[in-house]
Swiss-Prot record:
PANTHER family: UDP-N-ACETYLMURAMOYLALANINE--D-GLUTAMATE LIGASE. Its EC number is 6.3.2.9. InterPro entries: Mur-like_cat_sf, Mur_ligase_C, Mur_ligase_C_dom_sf, Mur_ligase_cen, MurD. It catalyses: UDP-N-acetyl-alpha-D-muramoyl-L-alanine + D-glutamate + ATP = UDP-N-acetyl-alpha-D-muramoyl-L-alanyl-D-glutamate + ADP + phosphate + H(+). The lineage of its organism: Bacteria, Bacillati, Bacillota, Bacilli, Lactobacillales. It is found in: Cytoplasm. It comes from Streptococcus uberis (strain ATCC BAA-854 / 0140J). This is UDP-N-acetylmuramoylalanine--D-glutamate ligase. GO terms for cellular component: cytoplasm. The keyword Plastid does not apply.
Amino acid sequence: MKECKTFNNKKVLILGLAKSGEAAARLLSRLGAIVTVNDGKAFEENPAAQSLLEEGIKVVCGSHPLELLDEDFAVMVKNPGIPYQNPMVEKALSKGIPVLTEVELAYLISEAPIIAITGSNGKTTTTTMIADVLNHGGKSALLSGNIGFPASEVAMTASQDDILTMELSSFQLMGIKDFHPHIALITNLMPTHLDYHGSFDAYIQAKWNIQNNMTADDVLILNAEQDQTKELAQKTQASLVYFSSKEKVEGAYQEDGKLFYKGEYIMDAQSLGVPGLHNVENALATIAVAKLSGISNQAIAETLSSFGGVKHRLQKLGTIKDVAFYNDSKSTNILACQKALSGFDNNKVILIAGGLDRGNAFDTLIPDIKGLKKMILLGESAEKMKEAAERAGVGYLEAKDVADATRIAFEQAQPGDIILLSPANASWDMYPNFEVRGDEFIESFQQLKGDME
């Protein structure tokens, strides 16, 4: 851990706990800061706050009292999910208090160089792919950030021989100041989290913060297929490398079903361990990072051919009576479902879809679902998805939940078929999050498998 005197004897307010807030509180305390933690959850139900109090850190729980900011805080470190319209955040900003996120702290103390990955879709899969390839190629890559391992916690023990492979959300990137990765990757940009950012332009700007401090000695990797790329490319000091599944570019690309980097053949696309056009794109982005990091073509190809996916992201669960099950519960929008379907022959696919009704029409999904063997529909959006199925000429059945849908799908399946959970909708009408939805699918698969044995 690098020496950092920035916060020594400075009052710092941590707004919101969760994993990142807890990690930030411990790090700042270690750096000599006078830390106060404020979390909305009651103290009695808040084991993280209880633990921090035992360590001598001041905690204020159960509400967010504005008068707390009457103290002379030098910095606020907020949970990324707390919006900037929050009264505490607004008051801090009005008083001129810098509002940071925990990844900024990670950068300030990290001895390890940082590879930073952001984007609308594919962040977690690509971050995991990159770490796996780097590790197989002889590097020491440490997963961190929005992937479940607080960046500041990982950075505390990372050495200069490690590489922090960091997944970053737009929320986290709004709270950086000096953050400076050596390699940064933007997988793609789609209009998401608009309720938080207010507009697509504001969302893009948040993502673009990733390159704010990069220089010509650093490399920014961009998706050449994105409409915004040409304009954004003119606004960075970083050196540029591109990836594309559709055209030859200065970087990583697909040509005639083969993956290349600057003219060097890496592997066949069909040898990738995970299906779908989106995973070709994820692999190309990974290849760009790997080649820039000095990894051999052999190590890249070996890792990507054996990569089995990430939980809830087109994760292959296995087969029952030669029927394959894929869990893509992270598919919370139409684009994610389209990309999942691109990896399969539709006439063998039984698609489980539906969820929170956000007012979407599913017209854009119609070309992608044509020829499906069957659709099993559930949730608030089922009625609208029925209309899309009818227009695509696809038969459908209804289910009351994912477990019911899994059973119905298996009853419809024949050997060689694929049962794909790729909802194209958020989960919140029926489940707390996509993970719980996906876990129900996994449990249903395991129960069916047990029943067949």
